[in-house]
Amino acid sequence: METTSIFKEYFDITKKYTAQYGNNTILLLQVGSFFEIYGMRNKAGEIYGSSISDLCQVCQLNVSEKKVHHNGDQILMAGFRDYALERYIPRILDANYIAVVYVQEKSGKGFIRKLDAIYSPGTYLNPESTTSVSNNIMCIWIDKTKVRKQQKLVIGLSVVNI
C-alpha cells in the first residue's frame, strides 16, 4: 500500500525544520492520543527521513513497521502517549536534539496539526530539575527605529535579583 497524507505531512515538516535547525532535529507529531515519530527504510535496509533509530534508543521506544510505503520505501513508526510528553522532552534534549512538537486540533469534521513548541537544549527549563535556580530575572528589549533616515537598533537590558 502506498503512502497516506499523514506520512507525507510528517516528512515535509521534518525536512523544513531539519533545514532550519540541523540534523539533530526530531518532529513529534500528535496523532490522536499519541505523539508519533516516523522514518523510512529503503530496500538496502538503510533508515532515513528522520532520526527515529537514534531517538528510540535514547527514549527506549520500540520501532514498528507500518504496512504502508512512501516513495516505495517501508514506513517505520514509534511513539508514546500524549500525557508522557514532559517525560520524554528532557531525554530528547539530553541527547542534544531539538524537539519540534506539532499538536492536533479539531477543525470541522477533521483535524489540523499546528506547531505547539520547539524545545532545544538551550531554551528548556525542566520543571522537575533538582538543579538550583537563581532568583534573577532578565528582560531584553530590542527595537529597530529610524533616526534621521537611518536604521538604528536600540537594545535595552535589565536584570533584577528578586
What are these language model-derived features?
Residues M1-I162:
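Basic, polar low-complexity surface loops/patches
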